[in-house]
Structure formats: structure tokens, C-alpha cells
Amino acid sequence: MGIARILSAVLFLSVLFVVTFPTLLSADHHDGRIDTCRLPSDRGRCKASFERWYFNGTTCTKFVYGGYGGNDNRFPTEKACMKRCVKA
């Protein structure tokens, strides 16, 4: 009875993996990584004032980052934002 349960669990996990794996490769991923350029701008949770750049869907735009939190759609320079997010 123990072997049957183990085999059932392995089969279940295998089917689960096969069913969910294509979702991991969906439109929110680019070149195998999450496409940060599609994330909204996020100032973060603190009150510092750091000049950063985010991609707004069309171009890179300056915003004030609070210094902590936020998301990965945040770049130190316009050039870094353009390099990552603007498709040539």
C-alpha cells in the first residue's frame, strides 16, 4: 500500500507540472525571465527621493523612488531603461 501511494503522488505531481509549466512561459516572460517592463511604476514604501526611470509601455519616464520596496520596473538611468525595455 505504501508503494502505491508514493507512485500516485509522483504521478499527480508529474501531471501537475506538465499542466502548469506552459503558464510559466506565458506572455509575462521574455527570454526566460519575467518582463519587468510590463510592471506599473511603483514608488516604494519609504520617503526618500531617488531619481529613477521606469518604462510606461511606450517610453522611459522619470519618477521619484522612495528607496525601499517597489518592483523591478525601476532603472538608475534612462539609458538602462531604454536598453532593457525598448525593442529595436
Curated annotation (Swiss-Prot):
GO cellular component: extracellular region
Keywords for the protein's UniProt record, in alphabetical order: Disulfide bond, Protease inhibitor, Secreted, Serine protease inhibitor, Signal
Protein name: Kunitz-type U15-theraphotoxin-Hhn1p
Homology family: Belongs to the venom Kunitz-type family. 01 (intermediate) subfamily.
Major localization listed first in the record, in broad terms: secreted
Function comment: Serine protease inhibitor that inhibits trypsin at a molar ratio of 1:1.
Superkingdom per UniProt: Eukaryota
Disulphide-bonded residues: 37-85, 60-81
Organism: Cyriopagopus hainanus
